[in-house]
Amino acid sequence: EMCIRDRYYPAQYEEMKKYIGEGRWHISGSSWDATDALVPSTESFIRNIMLGQQYYRQEFGVESTDIFLPDCFGFGWTLPTIASHCGLIGFSSQKLDWRVHPFYGKSKHPFTIGLWKGIDGSSIMLAHGYDYGRRWNDEDLSENEQLKELAGRTPLNTVYRYYGTGDIGGSPTLASVRSVEKGLRGNGPVEIVSATSDQLYKDYLPYKNHPELPVFDGELLMDVHGTGCYTSQATMKLYNRQNELLGDAAERAAVTAEWLNQAKYPGSTINEAWKRFIYHQFHDDLTGTSI
């Protein structure tokens, strides 16, 4: 999205860069593209993060520390391992609350806030929002009974909540902004904190000092269209896999050629090729949920 803004809205992009430098606009997500989290290979996922972080460093002089995927249709057991090995500390989504049926006991997700353990035993913090698509009314959130009840479910007495316009894009609605502002000034039983997407994770580092955090060791699955989208548009998935294999072969050949003093490693060419098809690993593209 930032690359598109850079190309088509250069004036607004420069204004945004100024806000980032002033600490008024915060980056999140770490990746080049808001990827699907099940079809792409591990190599694709790691390169997606690498390219995203390179872009953040080059354009803004900062890096992201989290995986931010509010709208994907399930999350594989490898994701905490990949994120941890990329130096990331947390992951958030809200999509699992859109499930039709409970899957983790009586709940649609294992917990609201805790640790998610990957296949190699490494862990990141998992924060799951609730009530997919919910918007706040123009009221004092510090008095919100639902927030109070949800926070009470966790050992940290905390709830993580997105706010904004959602699928149709754009900034938070005026009513949502006013509700947060009233909550920040409010004196109710709920303390409202306006924070970046990764602040929660940073506040509880190192995680080993918080044995009260629940641990989930497994996949985060999605029903509704989250099942069919991994079999639909099979040709697109075939081309994606062919691109991944070609990217791996090109990397090996290029490195070997440089080792043998036969050619200079074409780093920018390889990166641009990966960007072109990682762009199509977007969670509403590769999954076949868009035209």
List each model region and its residues.
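Catalytic-domain carbohydrate-binding cleft regions of carbohydrate-active enzymes
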Residues: E1, R5-I291
